[in-house]
Amino acid sequence: MRRRGGRIAALASAAILVVAGCSAPNRDGGSAGGNAEIGKSSDINPQDPASLKKGGNLRLAIGALPSNFNTLNIDGNEADNGSMQRPTMPRSFTIAPDGSMKVNTDYFTSVELTKTDPQVVTYTINPKATWSDGAPITWEDIASQINATSGKDKAFAIASPNGSDRVASVTRGVDDKQAVVTFAQHYPEWRGMFAGNTMLLPKSMTANPDVFNKGQLDKPGPSAGPFVVSSVDRTAQRVTLSRNPNWWGTPPLLDSITFLALDDAARIPALQNNTIDATGIASLDELKIAQGTEGISIRRAPGPSWYHL
């Protein structure tokens, strides 16, 4: 996805994102870049994927490499870690441009509330869905993760139960590709149990406390996405994702995604130096720098926010 033209800066309601062309070697203007004016409340410049070129390396910044790649673990529960692994892991729902939730059919053919008293949710897994180690994704992965994050065994250092503490049982459905989750207490946010940064992990990574807590300290475990983590370089503070050769869904346009650990103060200079392709803006000073840099465009869109109380 090499984009002729400059870098793009996007402004959200509470934050600004500055984006450069996807590793583009040139910075000679173009429809996707070079405009440093702040647009309307939403001007993200959406494009039909069919109109985009294939290939390229998207370079993004993160705060630091995670001390634990397990996003369900208390030490791995970081926004950057979740964002970095989203292209590599199963999630049950996606958010459409209009804000609605849709079943992620790459992984599930259906996710339905099949009973209300007691509450029962049935997950039917895509027959093609497979972990990167060759194991099929089955109901046992869902059962193992719910057991690990339920809080019943305190040896699992979980970040949050995320509804697992309300589950009475997880049973096999019509076959190994279906999980029937029965709740002991109603859980209105059941759609979020395997969505967002709470991705589904393989049972090999949630089967016991030792592997849950220590099995992903150096690198992620088996994954199942259009991309796989192909390199973790702690010396260079860089993580590289490459295409999953066994991906069963729509092939990604990008060849790779690179995440580079940078301090906040280093991100705008890195964008100016064409080291990264996108970053957020957190202050008026950074906005002014972005506006004054040739080849940078600023994009703005509403962004949801929430607080722990």
Where are these regions (language model features)?
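Short, well-ordered beta-strand elements
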Residues: G55-A64, T109, Q119-Y123, Q145-I146, ...
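Bacterial lipoprotein signal-peptidase II cleavage site
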Residues: C22-G33
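Gly/Pro-rich hinge or "lid" segments in bacterial periplasmic/extracellular proteins
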Residues: A195-G249, S256
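Aromatic- and charge-enriched surface segment that lines or borders ligand/interaction sites
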Residues: S110-A155
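N-terminal lobe/hinge region of extracytoplasmic solute-binding protein
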Residues: L58-T116, N147, P222
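Ligand-site clamp/hinge motif
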Residues: N244-I289
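Ligand-binding "clamshell"
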Residues: K288-R300
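Surface-exposed binding/hinge segments that line
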Residues: K53, T124, A159-A207
